């Protein structure tokens, strides 16, 4: 078995790690960063940018720069109304009811898994550059409170990126693995994970290499983005008061406000106030307008208090579901960049009655845990067992629109449960099995994961047929359901794929698109490198002509000038092979100047000249070898 990489596919940033010699290692990307912005952009030339380069052009290209796409993963369009208001790009309803992004620069509607796949591809390439070998397998993390559709969407993203996703792991569980890899004694830990777009709380029991999740809870609509949004709303309100100009419909201004808000939030974790200066934010008839405010930590904490308080209830529920009291918990581990906010650390202390443990890097712990899980699967991380849970209850709709639960939330996975049902009407020959996920009593109040029909049931009075419904949740938290007529033995099975999910055909098409993008990216890089070499050669040759042009024949000088012109013309076009051949031709022609420079250097150094003469023919042979090497 090859290497299995661990990927934290985050809302704001992503991170990749690998097990080496029994230890997890975080891999730096090509820009030298240990985390990569989860941002994908498309330029007006249709070029795809991923990571920091995409982030760098957000302000000037807001409608084609996609960030926080994780908030839309596996979601139906009607479920993301609040998320749509937070982003400048266009989110539309897809053909099958899911949320999709319309990217004007490439005139294409893209699914969230397809966009996330671009970030996963960057992570995959980062690992491949480090390892010097192809990577095809990964463990990818998701928020613990992700439902089945969101988990399936994450697996689809991995497939589109050319990765066989060996395991989907809950982020708090991964962080606990990172924390507990070298811990030998038994303890109960709480993982408080506040990322860019989601909040999770998990309670785990650690001991003797066993990591057992006791309970989990969370909010998939709460994260650092919401804190940024509060600052943005405040700045828009204050600026409108001062200048009577509303910035809320100016997409470029909003993008600048988002950057400034994120920066101010980060600054306020270490300072009591942050200055926000955005010159030329807009203009009116009187000229340009500048935005300048000072935000204090006290004001910020007042603005976000309702968000901070929203994390309290899930924590209390998780403690209760685990059958514990807050005082039973030995350590509280903070994960996610937003846990650096002092108000968050304060409420954690209030809930659990202790200072949180800050020994784990909140940006890297999840990827490290994913790499450890990869090591468990390959056998590199020995004597470790991970027992996770399903975050939400699963069941089916029964008579009267009631949800009948088969698997309760916080059940250890993998698991399988069966229950026998019957028909609701006389002579009923088929049953429609509607699969639900959630905690409400009525079916209509829970999420429909999918439905299927078991037909061919022999006509009989109601209540007579025996239909066994079985739920099977695998280690990834993905649901498989079957229904069997006990009388005839006829069985119908499905792997739940949300009605708003991607079809196999769509995934295959997206895989091919991703592969073609990889080829495009390679060609683009090759073209840029060829242009850089050509420009550098033109500059050096023109400089040398100025200095030594009088010392070569007019014929040679004219030939070099012609080759420079031909190379400049090739630079204007898009034919890379022509550019390379013209670069080679100028290189050959410029050797005449190199000869003159060499002779000049010899003439100006008599001692060196004598030494060269004494060296005899062997020295000349070496010179020719070096020139020959250059030609290669």
UniProtKB/Swiss-Prot annotation:
Start-end of Basic and acidic residues biased regions: 618-632
InterPro entries: ATPase_NBD, Chaperone_DnaK, Heat_shock_70_CS, HSP70_C_sf, HSP70_peptide-bd_sf, Hsp_70_fam
PROSITE patterns according to UniProt: HSP70_1, HSP70_2, HSP70_3
Organism in which the protein naturally occurs: Borrelia duttonii (strain Ly)
Role played: Acts as a chaperone.
Record protein name field: Chaperone protein DnaK
Pfam families xrefs: HSP70
PANTHER family: HEAT SHOCK PROTEIN 70KDA
GO molecular function, a single term: unfolded protein binding
Similarity-based family: Belongs to the heat shock protein 70 family.
Record PTM Phosphothreonine, positions in chain: 198
Triggers of expression: By stress conditions e.g. heat shock.
